[in-house]
Amino acid sequence: MQTATGPVAMNVLMHGKAYDPAQAFAAIAPVASTYMIVVAGVNQPYDDLAGLAAYSKATPGKVSYASAGVGAVPHIGTEFVNLKLDGGLTHVPYRGESQFIPDLLSGTVSSAMMIAGSALPLIKSGKLKPLAVTASRRSPALPDVKTLDEQGVGATLPLWWGFIAPTGTPPAILDKVNRDLREVLADPALRKRYADMVLEVPPESTPAQFQASMVDEAAKWADMVRKTRITLTAE
């Protein structure tokens, strides 16, 4: 089975979910990772997070951020940025990135945190401008854009995907699938396709290391939800 940042980090926080996915499944291996970019329309009067927060404070109630939905990773991430910078941004939830992009381009909403693969083409074409990247280091595609950490947020918010198995799967099977996935990920053709989609091959990880990483991710996002006081409700 495949999993990602959202299910592992968020489901445990939602009412009605009786299990912690980081404990209910056995980790196999991470297979891809990327980052997000905080963006704004090119006509907005700010170029970084400090400018966004300052403009919001100067125009109370007028500055907003779009998200792909309540409880989505970008929603929690942006709300944490909002909290750390005391930005006073208003959340405007949509049903996915494609739904809010027209409003972001027109200035109907002021900003958004988008997946890099979706945001970069719009940035390169001059339709959006980047304010920050959520990776632990600056993006080679945007070397002049500072990370969240560099702008005082104190957080790194990567996105990742990986494979898991039911709890109780024999360790020998987990190890074998882990090795098989490593071989697949070493393929130069696959790595080129990843690069085209703004994805990275994660460092090699044992099942135990990936399991620990999932637990850490769930704890990190739980802490952000607690600090921002966001309520997540399962349907």
Tell me what each language-model feature is.
Residues 80-84, 98-108, 117-125, 214-215:
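Short helices/loops that flank or line small-molecule/ion binding pockets
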Residues 124, 171-235:
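An extracytoplasmic/periplasmic, membrane-proximal ligand-sensing/linker region
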Residues 12-99, 146-148, 153, 158-193:
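Hinge/capping helix and adjacent helix->loop/strand transition within the periplasmic-binding protein
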Residues 4, 18, 48, 93, ...:
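Conserved functional loop/turn residues at catalytic and ligand-binding sites
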Residues 1-7, 12, 68, 97, ...:
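Beta->alpha turn/N-cap motifs
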Residues 1-2, 59-63, 87, 105-114, ...:
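Alpha-to-beta junction loops
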Residues 2, 26, 62-66, 200, ...:
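Short, well-ordered beta-strand elements
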Residues 26, 127-140:
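Conserved helix-loop-beta element of the AMP-binding
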